[in-house]
């Protein structure tokens, strides 16, 4: 009985840095490349819009004294609209990139976790500690103690 307990303790000490594993997966590297490409595309479009905005701002500012009040107000409104459009586009881009990351990486993270569990099971481990900073236990086939602990506490 003491040997079984000692073996369990040894099994719990085995660990893996899941973050390192995931970051080295070829599919993850490919997904990251797709995400970076999308980020660059959005960045280029945002920079072009910002440049257009800056150019108009300079042109309108330099020409403001030669224009009527109505024209200057219309130009101011146009610039405000451009500013709002750029901000909205930046938000949309950030959300789109975040969604793309989730869509591409979630199945790969699940694939890595399943592989860790499979290897742990094959090697007879109940639990594997995730050595990633802030990582947790990765459950393989360990016993859930909830019912036993509830019984011990009398409920």
Could you say what each language-model-derived stretch is?
Residues 119, 152-155:
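Conserved, well-folded catalytic cores of nucleic-acid-processing
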Residues 13-93:
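Early exported N-terminus immediately downstream of N-terminal targeting peptides
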Residues 93, 97-101:
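Long, charged amphipathic alpha-helices with heptad-repeat/coiled-coil character
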Residues 1-12:
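Single conserved hydrophobic/aromatic residue that forms the stacking wall/gate
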Residues 106-109:
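Structured alpha/beta interaction-core segments
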Residues 116-141:
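Extended, charged amphipathic interaction segments
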Residues 18-20, 27, 84, 132-134, ...:
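Solvent-exposed coil/turn segments that connect beta secondary-structure elements
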């Amino acid at each position: 009985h003491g040997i079984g307990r000692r073996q369990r303790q040894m099994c719990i000490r085995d660990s893996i840095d899941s973050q390192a594993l995931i970051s080295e997966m070829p599919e993850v590297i490919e997904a990251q490349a797709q995400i970076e490409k999308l980020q660059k595309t959005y960045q280029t479009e945002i920079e072009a819009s910002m440049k257009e905005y800056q150019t108009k701002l300079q042109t309108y500012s330099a020409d403001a004294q030669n224009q009527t009040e109505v024209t200057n107000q219309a130009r101011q409104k146009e610039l405000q609209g451009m500013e709002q459009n750029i901000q909205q586009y930046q938000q949309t881009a950030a959300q789109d990139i975040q969604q793309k990351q989730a869509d591409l990486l979630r199945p790969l993270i699940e694939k890595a976790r399943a592989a860790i569990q499979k290897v742990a099971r094959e090697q007879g481990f109940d639990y594997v500690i995730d050595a990633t900073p802030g990582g947790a236990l990765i459950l393989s086939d360990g016993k859930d103690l909830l019912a036993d602990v509830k019984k011990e506490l009398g409920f």
